[in-house]
């Protein structure tokens, strides 16, 4: 990871966060011993999301069995056993925060036979029991292509299923050496084929070395695999030890990706801005579901 770092452009500046609300949410999460991807992955939107009383919960962590060189979550080849109290603690946080829409994601757990699918199910069931009106979005790993594990998760009936494609296929060996582009596409297709009422979602980063043409090709692939919602955001390197930023994509180009995806390719929604992350403003999906009921 060498080379001079690019200077961050002005459009990547974020508003000063509301420290009081951030502190309140952080204290709640600490008290319940819960992690968020907002904190663990150094998300630039943490101030806005915490100030709005929302968070994307990270389960089965903190260590991840994969070591993707763009990601700020710690690698752990032998992570701790799953915590059976985690689902109940998560449901308590959702209830206390009075969330209308909750996003749950996880680290990769390749050490588990089902990749952690059972823990996702337990979390959904706990939330349904305590907060039955809250809609649930899952951001899942690829389960190493274990479609039985996927079926287990989908059987718990989340409203939205997200699996991020992350980058263009040419960069997989460099950025996602333990993942497979076609496997991720197949997972997304399986979701729409087997559970057509569920809204499928995926996301990718730009600035890792891809071209604009390659981004469009990924969008075309995602649409062919019947994905409904796509997020596109700027990659920001967490540290000098991680993959460097290759380019900063302009807001105008992000708008082009959005327009192409929605008007030409027919996605229900493309959220494409420099600061977009896969669960940024995820609560807006409720309006999308109301406009396109299934």
From Swiss-Prot:
Cofactor(s) listed: [4Fe-4S] cluster
Pathway: Protein modification; protein lipoylation via endogenous pathway; protein N(6)-(lipoyl)lysine from octanoyl-[acyl-carrier-protein]: step 2/2
InterPro entries hit by this protein: Aldolase_TIM (IPR013785), Elp3/MiaA/NifB-like_rSAM (IPR006638), Lipoyl_synth (IPR003698), rSAM (IPR007197)
A Pfam family assignment: Radical_SAM
Database matches in SUPFAM superfamilies: Radical SAM enzymes
Enzyme class, broadest EC rank: transferase
Keyword Repeat included in the entry's annotation: no
Originating gene: lipA1
Protein family according to the UniProt entry: Belongs to the radical SAM superfamily. Lipoyl synthase family.
Co-factor remark: Binds 2 [4Fe-4S] clusters per subunit. One cluster is coordinated with 3 cysteines and an exchangeable S-adenosyl-L-methionine.
A GO molecular-function annotation: metal ion binding
Main localization of the protein described in the UniProt heading: cytoplasm
Domain Radical SAM core span(s) in chain numbering: 50-268
Keywords: 4Fe-4S, Cytoplasm, Iron, Iron-sulfur, Metal-binding, S-adenosyl-L-methionine, Transferase
Catalyses which reaction(s): [[Fe-S] cluster scaffold protein carrying a second [4Fe-4S](2+) cluster] + N(6)-octanoyl-L-lysyl-[protein] + 2 oxidized [2Fe-2S]-[ferredoxin] + 2 S-adenosyl-L-methionine + 4 H(+) = [[Fe-S] cluster scaffold protein] + N(6)-[(R)-dihydrolipoyl]-L-lysyl-[protein] + 4 Fe(3+) + 2 hydrogen sulfide + 2 5'-deoxyadenosine + 2 L-methionine + 2 reduced [2Fe-2S]-[ferredoxin]
Residues annotated to bind [4Fe-4S] cluster 1: 38, 43, 49, 279
Identification of the protein by name: Lipoyl synthase 1
Gene Ontology CC: one annotated term: cytoplasm
Compartments, record wording: Cytoplasm
Keyword Iron-sulfur: yes
EC number annotated for this UniProt entry: 2.8.1.8
Organism, as annotated: Prochlorococcus marinus (strain MIT 9313)
